[in-house]
């Protein structure tokens, strides 16, 4: 079944095909009605110049604007406080310019999100540590299944295994 992480408490639209193999029926987790927004995950950092963040130069901003115009980009990678984020991937997190996720600072400059902000948008707790250099950390974050989605899937799997099972004969009847 295709699940969108935004429906399970993750502040990001992230659709993934999840396959659960089980002899009897399996019920996927119930979706949540309210969506977690970017400002709820990174609102404390998105309006400031965070240590370790990369501010786009005027040349990079110009390049991005030209790229988005030429590619008829209707959904740029800017993060909007009142919406869930677009899908984070290892490619668009560590990218140098055009495809990276970025926040708009109050003074009009834009900066790339930090590893910690990306991790929060994936639902990792702040205490979780990633290893390696910046690119390796962004790769780990971008390739990960959001922990909140994984947790809710694990609960559904646990619930399935705690139910009484039918015998092969009962299933074929």
Regions found by a protein language model. Give the residues of each.
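C-terminal target-recognition/interaction regions appended to catalytic cores
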Residues: 48, 52-173
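Class I S-adenosyl-L-methionine
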Residues: 1-81
């Amino acid at each position: 079944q295709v699940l969108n992480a935004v429906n399970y408490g993750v502040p990001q639209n992230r659709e993934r095909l999840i396959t659960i193999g089980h002899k009897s029926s399996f019920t996927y987790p119930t979706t949540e009605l309210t969506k977690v927004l970017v400002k709820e995950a990174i609102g404390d950092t998105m309006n400031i110049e965070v240590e370790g963040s990369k501010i786009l130069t005027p040349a990079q901003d110009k390049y991005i604007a030209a790229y988005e115009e030429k590619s008829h980009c209707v959904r740029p990678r800017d993060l909007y406080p009142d919406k869930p984020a677009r899908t984070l991937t290892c490619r668009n997190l560590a990218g140098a310019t055009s495809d990276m996720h970025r926040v708009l600072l109050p003074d009009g400059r834009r900066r790339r999100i930090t590893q910690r902000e990306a991790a929060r948008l994936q639902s990792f707790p702040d205490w979780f540590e990633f290893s390696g250099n910046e690119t390796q950390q962004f790769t780990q974050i971008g390739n990960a299944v959001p922990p909140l989605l994984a947790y809710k899937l694990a609960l559904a799997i646990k619930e399935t295994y705690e139910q009484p099972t039918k015998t092969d004969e009962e299933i074929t009847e």
